Amino acid sequence: MKYKFIRILCFTLLAAGIAACTPGMKSTTEKRYTFADILDISYTPDTLHRCYGWFTDAGSWMGFTLPERQQWVNGFCGPFSLDMFRRQWMAQSAAVVSFAKDTQEIFVPDSTCYYPGELYMSAHSTHGSITQRLNFTSASTALLRIEADTAEDLLFSGSQWGKDITVSVEQNSVIARHPSGETVTVTFTPNVELAKTDNNYTALVRSPRYPVNVALSLIHISEPTRRS
């Protein structure tokens, strides 16, 4: 029942992402872009060096980082669980995107930026360029918006899921569960072809209409107890 409610919530957020912005929202967004890169939160998760900051918003218990240019991943890194008792990268990246015709092709970073309330990144391969934006829509969910300069099919997958995490596919959502009770959901629109592959997933978007919207959520099963 809980996951059914979460899927309904994520679909609602995806629909909101597709809808046009109001004039007030547009004004706020324009102001946001006057404060580019006031923080450097570039970090690709590994065991060699520490992370010193995450992008988080709306009172969320999860955070994301921009990938480092020298260790590029074509997706925002995370989510990272900010649980005060058990901090962990739930994935190096829960949603990595590529062109479906050549998923092994290397993407070259063009631009990354932290804005107040938004992460931005763009990269290119020989097949075209892909831009991505990430904004929190609530304490538990962030909306990922993807655009490309070509109508070629896109393919999503996860990169390096965290220790002890089990991945499954339920309807239009990817469910990544940790034994602690923390669960990551990656929710796609109904037209996406979603499949489970080993302990991971693939999501194929055919002839995409941009922007492509994906909801990333981190649910804490014990959250009411922690916050009481």
Task: List where the protein language model places each region.
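Terminal accessory carbohydrate-recognition/targeting modules of carbohydrate-active enzymes
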Residues: 21-218, 222, 226-228
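Bacterial N-terminal signal peptides that target proteins for export
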Residues: 2-10
